[in-house]
């Protein structure tokens, strides 16, 4: 019997397009597919990029983003969604208005601000709109260290400072804050921070805060430059797990396992920061069966 569309888990990505395929909606849709979720997209901007960096950003009109979201929501339905690159305050407001229109609850906000090569993907004046318009609608927000600093207004050099930032960000509305540790090197005791590359085997700690408890998800840092799209992929995996009905903490752990596998088996493509391997997690699961 043909499976009805209403029974298929569906996830929407609202983000920019990456011509190199390693990040943005391309990474999100690959991740959804690998986790058996039907993927849909609303494009907010076209980026001209490859593994060497971003050479052009062309934001779409806010109305174009809103109409894409409305087309998906009014017909296909959305079990969970994630936002990525939103570029400016006008697009953020348009996206937030559509989320409110459909009263979607499983919302993952990846506050994309800076590309791997340092290019700006969110205008400075848009950070306030992100805090005020989008975070109150988020179930989960997934900043890296620099993004957490921008959202919280706090410098983050120690684990205690990361915890304080998580508290401040959660007060803006999201149910759970996940501050990713990929930009930091510290031990679980809250040591100092180094922004340099590190050898494999050094711990990387993602901090999860639900308003009552802090959870530290510890993994091994992988020594590779091929990490393009890690943030997009992590948040997409989290949204996919939520679309399938996973509880929040379970969804975070699924996303953590997915991105760990993707980084460990990352792809040596291009001449710069290559992409992660979106099929690595599925292949590992197949081996276990």
Enumerate the predicted regions with their spans.
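Charged C-terminal helix
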Residues: 8, 59, 249-289
């Amino acid at each position: 019997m043909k499976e009805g569309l209403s029974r298929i888990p569906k996830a929407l990505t609202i983000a920019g397009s990456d011509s190199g395929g390693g990040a943005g909606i391309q990474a999100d849709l690959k991740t959804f597919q690998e986790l058996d979720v039907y993927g849909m997209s609303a494009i907010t901007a076209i980026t001209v990029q490859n593994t060497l960096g971003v050479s052009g950003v062309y934001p779409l009109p806010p109305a174009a983003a809103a109409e894409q979201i409305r087309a998906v929501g009014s017909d296909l339905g959305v079990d969970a969604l994630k936002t990525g690159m939103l570029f400016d305050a006008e697009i953020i407001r348009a996206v937030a208005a559509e989320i409110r229109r459909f009263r979607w609850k499983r919302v993952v906000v990846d506050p994309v601000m800076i590309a791997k090569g340092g290019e700006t993907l969110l205008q400075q004046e848009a950070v306030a709109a992100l805090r005020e318009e989008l975070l109150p609608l988020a179930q989960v927000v997934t900043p890296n260290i620099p993004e957490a600093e921008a959202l919280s207004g706090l410098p983050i050099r120690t684990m205690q400072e990361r915890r304080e930032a998580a508290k401040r960000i959660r007060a803006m509305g999201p149910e759970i804050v996940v501050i990713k540790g990929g930009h930091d090197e510290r031990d679980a005791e809250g040591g100092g921070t180094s922004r340099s590359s590190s050898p494999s085997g050094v711990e990387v700690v993602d901090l999860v805060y639900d308003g009552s408890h802090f959870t530290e998800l510890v993994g091994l840092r992988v020594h590779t430059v091929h990490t393009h799209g890690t943030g997009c992929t992590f948040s997409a995996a989290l949204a996919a797990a939520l679309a399938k009905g996973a509880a929040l903490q379970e969804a975070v752990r699924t996303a953590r396992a997915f991105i760990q596998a993707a980084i460990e088996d990352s792809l040596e493509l291009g001449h710069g920061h290559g992409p992660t391997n979106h099929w690595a997690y599925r292949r590992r699961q197949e081996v276990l069966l």
